[in-house]
């Protein structure tokens, strides 16, 4: 998940859709004020998901309020749903009198559900996150709502909290990833 103040975009990372690769590419364009909620690398960019790495905006709050209540609520993480990103950004938006979420370009990638499940199956199998279940057993668990997806099917990550509206400006189909990213980068 990335929030770029320099380029005014929010990349909402979904599961098994090249999210880490997209983050790795975008990383080179980020500044110290941008949020990069991915803990694989820390080269001075805000990779721990802190909204305010240089404390430039914390002066809007008294020190106790910021340290005790606000900073804990402003952490971001890699596969954070859009509604929660919006909710956390709204805390600063009110103080800045500028709606960050609504004024930034928001994009995400989704994938054919079957391909996504196949990718997840092999990722879990190769990562030792699952026992010796066969793919057929996984499909049966999906049918019976017993497969632990952790939000794997992704579309709900792009919706508001009531699951009524999509909060992204643009959704890229994984099958058209290159064309979709070109469209985003030319925006």
Features from the language model and the residues they span:
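Membrane-interface amphipathic segments in extracytoplasmic regions
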Residues: 1-187
């Amino acid at each position: 998940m990335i929030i770029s103040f320099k380029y005014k975009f929010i990349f909402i990372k979904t599961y098994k859709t090249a999210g880490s690769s997209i983050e790795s590419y975008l990383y080179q364009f980020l500044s110290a004020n941008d949020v990069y909620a991915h803990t694989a690398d820390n080269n001075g960019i805000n990779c721990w998901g802190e909204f305010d790495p240089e404390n430039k905006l914390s002066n809007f709050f008294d020190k106790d309020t910021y340290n005790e209540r606000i900073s804990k609520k402003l952490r971001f993480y890699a596969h954070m749903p859009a509604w929660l990103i919006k909710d956390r950004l709204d805390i600063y938006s009110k103080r800045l009198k500028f709606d960050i979420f609504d004024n930034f370009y928001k994009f995400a990638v989704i994938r054919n559900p079957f391909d996504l499940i196949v990718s997840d199956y092999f990722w879990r199998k190769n990562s030792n996150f699952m026992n010796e279940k066969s793919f057929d057993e996984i499909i049966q668990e999906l049918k019976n709502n017993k497969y632990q997806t952790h939000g794997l099917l992704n579309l709900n990550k792009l919706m508001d909290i009531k699951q009524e509206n999509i909060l992204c400006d643009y959704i890229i189909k994984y099958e058209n990833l290159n064309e979709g990213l070109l469209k985003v980068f030319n925006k």
